[in-house]
Amino acid sequence: MWGFFGGAKKQDPKDTIISLRQQIIVLNKKNDNLIVQIQEQENLARKHVTTNKLMAKNALKKKKNLEKQQETVQGSIDSLQTSINTLETANLNLETMKAMQEGAKAMKQIHGNMNIDKVDKIMDETRDQVALSEEVSEAISRPYANAYDDEELEDELEALEQETLEGELTNAGHVKQDGVQVTPHDLPAAPNQVPAEEEDDEEEELRRLQREMAL
């Protein structure tokens, strides 16, 4: 159809391919019909080749004409098929190009506000934040520093040990007589002179108690 300005209306490649295929269908029917007619003329020539040579000769002439027509039709079919193949390839290339154009357009839109400097800056900031996060995690997991003076603790422990030993020795001074507990001042006064052997035993007992309390 001609437009208002005398130009032909552009036809979609797909519509053109459909039209060509329809034309091939028509030509194939004509080609099949010609093949049938060719075979009929050949059969007629064979039938009269011995009885009526003139009729047989005319049949062969018709056969030759039909064969030329069939060759022309077949050539047209082949040409149309080639055109269809070319159009299909071109249309496929066109659709591929359109898809690539859309993809490039989308990528351009995505990268519109992006450049290598911004990417490098973002990566640097990300690395800094990761390093900061690791430092914070390390600081949180680090145990508290020793808030006590070890020497002061040792002195306090020694004083406590001495106090405990003295208490134990005081309790050890109580003895039982006839089932009744008495204190040292209830016992008869001991002689001023203590045998050396008894002093050694007491010293040994005292050291033993100290060792037990130190455990």
Swiss-Prot record:
It is found in: Cytoplasm; Endosome membrane. Keywords: Coiled coil, Cytoplasm, Endosome, Membrane. It is a peripheral membrane protein. The keyword Glycoprotein does not apply. GO terms for molecular function: identical protein binding. The keyword DNA damage does not apply. InterPro entries: Snf7_fam. One of its GO terms (biological process) is intralumenal vesicle formation. GO terms for cellular component: cytoplasmic side of plasma membrane; cytosol; ESCRT III complex; multivesicular body. Required for the sorting and concentration of proteins resulting in the entry of these proteins into the invaginating vesicles of the multivesicular body (MVB). Also required for the proteolytic cleavage of the transcription factor RIM101 in response to alkaline ambient pH. Belongs to the SNF7 family. A component of the endosomal sorting required for transport complex III (ESCRT-III). This is Vacuolar-sorting protein SNF7. It comes from Yarrowia lipolytica (strain CLIB 122 / E 150) (Yeast). The gene is SNF7.
